[in-house]
Amino acid sequence: MQLNVSGAQAIEVSERTFGGEFNETLVHQAVVAYMAGGRQGSKAQKTRSEVSGGGKKPWRQKGTGRARAGTIRSPIWRGGGTTFAAKPRSHEQKLNKKMYRAALRSILAELVRLDRLVVVADFAVDAPKTKGLVAKLDTLGLKDVLIVTDGVDENLYLAARNLAHVDVRDVQGSDPVSLIAYDKVLVTVSAVKKFEELLG
């Protein structure tokens, strides 16, 4: 299949990488797994044995007419412990490499279908200046965009750092969440070739 390149000749790309069907279930699974992996998992609550105090029986067992109680830190008391207290844990979800790559292929193919993938021969800025990058994006009519390059471009990264709706990634730093988060994805021809190498 062919991909149109902005201001240049169309390029031949792999049907497998850029022309497959959209697997919504798999993409959803990949996005959830990716976001779960980013969770800190450090929340913690205290059980009745961990809450401070409550060592003394508040009143005797029998004869008061009140319900029996052994501690003021029982979960049914105000200020008591939590019955099933949350503890620090990993929220990581397993996703096979094969599935992860298939999800990325599915996203790329859908971006092509929805006309959200913009391919350019090359994309760089002369200096790490936001103004220069904004002007360059304006000529392409792009506002909310993820820029994907073949390798890390320091100038481009620094120029985009102050823009809320622009992000810069290299091919290996691209993930399911970033690829679907922006209105448009701007990729260079060399990045397209790299995607084919990694996902083909």
Swiss-Prot record:
The keyword Signal does not apply. GO terms for biological process: translation. Pfam families: Ribosomal_L4. One of its GO terms (cellular component) is ribosome. Keywords: Ribonucleoprotein, Ribosomal protein, RNA-binding, rRNA-binding. One of its GO terms (molecular function) is structural constituent of ribosome. The keyword DNA repair does not apply. Residues 38-65 are annotated as: Disordered. Belongs to the universal ribosomal protein uL4 family. Part of the 50S ribosomal subunit. One of the primary rRNA binding proteins, this protein initially binds near the 5'-end of the 23S rRNA. It is important during the early stages of 50S assembly. It makes multiple contacts with different domains of the 23S rRNA in the assembled 50S subunit and ribosome. PANTHER family: 50S RIBOSOMAL PROTEIN L4 (PTHR10746), LARGE RIBOSOMAL SUBUNIT PROTEIN UL4M (PTHR10746:SF6). HAMAP family: Ribosomal_uL4_B. This is Large ribosomal subunit protein uL4. It comes from Pseudomonas aeruginosa (strain LESB58).
